[in-house]
């Protein structure tokens, strides 16, 4: 494998997987734990029980953040331990609406965050979120 190295093989990695968040739709893990840090993949607003995607950015934000919280919790960490999030949004005009939902899940001191407008997301959802947390 081109990316393999002695360093990578010497670091303990643990794959994190949960049914309380949407499964991977490609060759990647839902999250990886390494040295007591949890790195999630992007989480989209798919209801993991039904596969349905809610209408509207607020409902999608609720589902995406709920999925992210479940993934972090099922890693053995907790939402309060999230130190960085990245939010990918389809429409920057939705930034304020997403912030209102974000504040329901994250409290001060808020995690560091990047927000990026993108042309398109998987399944044509309106946002995707990823996080880094410590354990």
Regions inferred by a protein language model and the residue ranges of each:
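Short, small-residue-biased leader/transition segments that mark boundaries at the very start
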Residues: 1-4
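Residue-level detector of intrinsically disordered terminal segments
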Residues: 7-11
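Short, polar/acidic, helix-capping and beta-turn segments at strand->helix junctions
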Residues: 12-135
């Amino acid at each position: 494998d081109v990316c393999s190295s002695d360093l990578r093989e010497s670091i303990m990695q643990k794959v994190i997987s949960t049914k309380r968040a949407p499964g991977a739709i490609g060759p990647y893990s839902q999250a990886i734990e390494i040295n007591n840090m949890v790195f999630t993949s992007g989480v989209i607003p798919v209801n993991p029980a039904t596969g349905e995607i809610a209408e509207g950015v607020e409902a999608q934000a609720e589902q995406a953040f709920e999925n992210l919280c479940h993934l972090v919790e099922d890693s053995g960490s907790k939402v309060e331990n999230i130190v960085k999030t990245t939010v990918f949004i389809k429409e920057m005009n939705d930034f304020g609406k997403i912030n209102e939902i974000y504040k329901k899940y994250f409290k001060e001191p808020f995690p560091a965050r990047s927000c990026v407008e993108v042309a398109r997301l998987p399944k044509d959802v309106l946002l995707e979120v990823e996080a880094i947390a410590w354990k």
